[in-house]
Protein backbone atom coordinates (compact mmCIF):
# COMPACT_ATOMS: atom_id res chain seq x y z
CA UNK A 1 0.00 0.00 0.00
CA UNK A 2 1.39 3.40 -0.94
CA UNK A 3 1.73 6.29 1.48
CA UNK A 4 -0.74 9.17 1.50
CA UNK A 5 1.97 11.49 0.15
CA UNK A 6 2.73 9.11 -2.73
CA UNK A 7 -0.98 8.86 -3.60
CA UNK A 8 -1.33 12.66 -3.49
CA UNK A 9 1.72 13.10 -5.72
CA UNK A 10 0.35 10.68 -8.32
CA UNK A 11 -2.99 12.49 -8.37
CA UNK A 12 -1.39 15.93 -8.66
CA UNK A 13 0.88 14.70 -11.46
CA UNK A 14 -2.02 13.06 -13.28
CA UNK A 15 -4.21 16.16 -13.09
CA UNK A 16 -1.38 18.59 -13.90
CA UNK A 17 -1.84 18.02 -17.63
CA UNK A 18 -4.74 19.98 -19.19
CA UNK A 19 -5.65 17.14 -21.55
CA UNK A 20 -5.85 14.63 -18.70
CA UNK A 21 -7.97 17.04 -16.65
CA UNK A 22 -10.33 17.42 -19.62
CA UNK A 23 -10.54 13.65 -20.07
CA UNK A 24 -11.16 13.16 -16.35
CA UNK A 25 -13.84 15.87 -16.37
CA UNK A 26 -15.50 14.21 -19.35
CA UNK A 27 -15.55 10.87 -17.56
CA UNK A 28 -17.28 12.42 -14.54
CA UNK A 29 -20.33 12.66 -16.81
CA UNK A 30 -20.25 8.97 -17.67
CA UNK A 31 -18.33 6.04 -19.05
CA UNK A 32 -16.65 6.39 -22.43
CA UNK A 33 -14.62 4.23 -24.80
CA UNK A 34 -11.15 5.26 -25.89
CA UNK A 35 -12.43 5.84 -29.45
CA UNK A 36 -15.12 8.23 -28.11
CA UNK A 37 -12.56 10.20 -26.14
CA UNK A 38 -10.26 10.32 -29.16
CA UNK A 39 -13.03 11.88 -31.26
CA UNK A 40 -14.19 14.21 -28.50
CA UNK A 41 -10.79 15.74 -27.83
CA UNK A 42 -9.16 15.55 -31.25
CA UNK A 43 -6.19 13.73 -29.72
CA UNK A 44 -4.55 10.64 -31.21
CA UNK A 45 -5.64 7.25 -29.88
CA UNK A 46 -2.16 6.46 -28.48
CA UNK A 47 -2.10 9.82 -26.66
CA UNK A 48 -5.57 9.24 -25.16
CA UNK A 49 -4.54 5.73 -24.10
CA UNK A 50 -1.39 7.11 -22.44
CA UNK A 51 -3.40 9.78 -20.61
CA UNK A 52 -5.87 7.13 -19.43
CA UNK A 53 -3.00 4.91 -18.25
CA UNK A 54 -1.66 7.80 -16.17
CA UNK A 55 -5.12 8.51 -14.71
CA UNK A 56 -5.58 4.80 -13.99
CA UNK A 57 -2.16 4.54 -12.33
CA UNK A 58 -3.17 7.44 -10.07
CA UNK A 59 -6.35 5.56 -9.13
CA UNK A 60 -8.63 8.15 -10.73
CA UNK A 61 -10.23 5.94 -13.40
CA UNK A 62 -10.97 2.28 -14.07
CA UNK A 63 -11.40 0.48 -17.35
CA UNK A 64 -13.43 -2.52 -18.42
CA UNK A 65 -12.96 -4.46 -21.62
CA UNK A 66 -15.93 -5.30 -23.80
CA UNK A 67 -14.76 -7.11 -26.90
CA UNK A 68 -12.07 -4.98 -28.50
CA UNK A 69 -13.18 -1.78 -26.76
CA UNK A 70 -12.09 -0.56 -23.35
CA UNK A 71 -14.57 1.64 -21.52
CA UNK A 72 -13.31 3.99 -18.83
CA UNK A 73 -15.12 5.56 -15.91
CA UNK A 74 -14.16 7.65 -12.90
CA UNK A 75 -13.17 5.76 -9.76
CA UNK A 76 -15.03 7.77 -7.07
CA UNK A 77 -12.66 6.74 -4.27
CA UNK A 78 -9.64 7.75 -6.34
CA UNK A 79 -9.93 11.44 -5.51
CA UNK A 80 -10.16 10.86 -1.73
CA UNK A 81 -6.44 11.46 -1.02
CA UNK A 82 -6.73 14.85 -2.72
CA UNK A 83 -9.92 15.70 -0.81
CA UNK A 84 -8.18 14.78 2.46
CA UNK A 85 -5.18 16.95 1.54
CA UNK A 86 -7.41 19.92 0.74
CA UNK A 87 -9.39 19.43 3.97
CA UNK A 88 -6.18 19.51 6.00
CA UNK A 89 -4.99 22.76 4.45
CA UNK A 90 -8.44 24.29 4.41
CA UNK A 91 -8.51 24.09 8.21
CA UNK A 92 -5.03 25.61 8.33
CA UNK A 93 -5.90 28.54 6.07
CA UNK A 94 -9.29 29.16 7.66
CA UNK A 95 -7.61 29.56 11.04
CA UNK A 96 -4.93 31.88 9.68
CA UNK A 97 -7.36 34.01 7.69
CA UNK A 98 -9.51 34.38 10.81
CA UNK A 99 -6.46 35.56 12.76
CA UNK A 100 -5.59 38.03 10.01
CA UNK A 101 -9.14 39.42 10.04
CA UNK A 102 -8.95 39.88 13.82
CA UNK A 103 -5.61 41.65 13.51
CA UNK A 104 -6.92 43.97 10.80
CA UNK A 105 -9.98 44.80 12.91
CA UNK A 106 -7.71 45.70 15.85
CA UNK A 107 -5.58 47.88 13.60
CA UNK A 108 -8.68 49.73 12.33
CA UNK A 109 -9.71 50.72 15.85
Question: Regions from the language model: what does each represent?
Answer:
Residues 52-53:
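Short, hydrophobic-biased segments on the C-terminal half of alpha helices
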Residues 1-7, 25, 80-109:
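Amphipathic alpha-helical dimerization/coiled-coil segments
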Residues 63:
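Short beta-strand "wing" residues that participate in macromolecule-binding interfaces
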Residues 2, 6-46, 66-80, 84:
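N-terminal helix-turn-helix DNA-binding core of bacterial DNA-binding proteins
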Residues 59:
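Glycine-centered, phosphate/nucleic-acid-interacting loop/turn motifs that mediate DNA/RNA or nucleotide
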